[in-house]
Design a protein with these regions (language model features):
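Hydrophobic membrane-insertion alpha-helices, especially the h-region
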Residues: 11-20
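Residue-level detector of intrinsically disordered/flexible regions characterized by low predicted structural confidence
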Residues: 4-5, 29-30, 59
């Protein structure tokens, strides 16, 4: 009995010593974490060019389509993907499209018919929006927010989507199912289309409706895509809007993350304007942001 008690005492002493040693070991500071993250991002930037100027058509992929390929599992029914494309468009009906006099007429033929607009399910409405003929216009402005406000003004599909209470749910499900390799192989503008989907998710109506669970699901999906992009030296995708989506979704849903951001004018500017100036965000703040996402 005495021998057993002695063993127990020894185990307790060893456990206490291990715990004390763990406390004594220097923990990596937020600033150190931030410096490391900044270094890795700089390395990524030198390897990857931003596909801001990606051509409207990927000439190297003759099998890709101009319409949005619906990811498997998004709809609970089989459907003709092209039903969500305007009857007049630059690829199917180039002569009719080229005959349009100006951008006003292009926008007019690109609207969703009124009888469909109010009766279509939100899941399918999202697909109409993904196929908007002029969706790339959102990239022609100084900020993504300004670009999406322009698309909202020009396109009835986006305006209707922003009124749907389940819009966030549909967009998040589509985003989670958006496989980078598969979509790029099938979609002639897959990289820009991902940015467009992320830009929709960043619209105020969507962000303001997010639950904490939805925000965390988005952050996890963003992290998965970011990891794949930065670890693929030949990836045609950019992480810029993906990073922004992860940040603004957490800012909208988490008081803890909002507190970290609000303590830094540079980080707050990034959230509010979508403008990232790395030198305006300290290593300490960057480290706190990275640590926050690692602990999700």
């Amino acid at each position: 009995m005495k021998k057993r008690s002695a063993i127990i005492v020894c185990i307790c002493i060893l456990a206490a010593a291990a715990f004390t040693l763990a406390l004594a070991l220097p923990k990596k500071s937020y600033a150190a974490i931030g410096r490391n993250a900044r270094k890795h991002y700089a390395e990524y930037e030198t390897r990857h060019s931003d596909p801001q100027d990606e051509p409207a058509k990927d000439e190297d992929n003759d099998s890709s389509e101009f319409w949005f390929p619906v990811p498997e599992g998004y709809l609970n029914k089989k459907t003709d993907e092209k039903k969500y494309v305007s009857s007049i468009n630059p690829d199917d009906t180039p002569e009719q499209w080229d005959a349009l006099e100006d951008a006003v007429q292009m926008r007019e033929v690109s609207q969703i018919p009124a009888d469909i607009l109010k009766t279509v399910s939100t899941d399918e409405l999202v697909l109409y929006c993904m196929n908007y003929n002029l969706f790339i216009d959102f990239m022609l402005f100084d900020t993504m927010q300004d670009g999406m406000e322009n698309v909202r003004s020009d396109y009835n599909g986006i305006r209707e989507l922003m009124t749907r209470p389940d819009a966030a749910e549909s967009l998040i499900r589509l985003y989670k199912l958006y496989d980078l390799d598969k979509q790029k192989a099938r979609d002639s503008v897959g990289c820009i289309r991902l940015r467009y989907l992320e830009a929709m998710l960043c619209m105020p109506e969507i962000l303001n409706s997010l639950t904490a669970k939805q925000a965390n699901e988005l952050a996890a999906a963003c992290a998965q895509k970011i990891s794949k992009i930065v670890n693929d030296e030949n990836s045609p995708y950019s992480v810029s809007t993906t990073m922004y989506l992860a940040a603004v979704s957490q800012y909208a849903a988490s008081e803890e993350f909002a507190e970290i951001v609000n303590a830094s004018s540079g980080a707050k500017r990034y959230i509010e304007e979508g403008i990232l100036v790395p030198d305006e965000i300290s290593d300490d703040t960057l480290g706190r942001i990275v640590s926050y996402f690692q602990e999700l």
